[in-house]
Amino acid sequence: TVARDCGFTGVQIHSAHGYLMSQFLSPLSNRRRDAWGGSLENRARALLEVIRGTRKAVGNDFPIAVKLNSADFQKGGFTEDESMQVVRWLGEAGIDLLEISGGNYEQMNMVGHPEDPAADKKPVAESTRRREAYFLDYATKVRPIATMPLMITGGFTARQSMLDALNAEELDVVGLARPLHRPPGTDERGLVVALKAFLPIAHAELNAEIDGKADEHHGKSHRNQV
């Protein structure tokens, strides 16, 4: 409700990468012997309860997304088959978007690829496209059972790869993070745009503050002289 009251238009429950909900899902980290551990149904209970509680708090018109591991990529961890079953339960819980990811901070399984400035100008081979989007194979498998839009963040670098995946309806949303910062000058351009918008306001406020302090100092000096 805090996010909604602050003007956000949705919220995501992070259940990947070894964070708390991900720890509950993984038998490698969840060693509980009560209703919250053991079977997959028990390990998924915490996440589903959080979703239900969130939905009750924010209502049906506020989007709830979940970020879920396709797998932990660790022996004895959360598996792809388990992940697909959790996707079914997430659909029953009525989430609005599923972001597919994988791994955790012990085994991220997310290795970047060298930046190719001409990537958008070259035909993208199927093998390259699959390698770019780390979890596209999983998205293809889970697509038939997913009742919510699918999002992939991780690996996309070429515009054509993104368009191909979207046009093939393998996913609905492409998430970007590092690619937005990779092109030379991206950070600088973003900073310049931000500064151009911010500096006039900051300059005016700073001048007003300086003028106010100057007037205050002048008044004190005048009183001391008197």
Stretches found by the model and what they are:
Residues 208-225:
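Intrinsically disordered, low-complexity, charge-rich segments with an acidic bias
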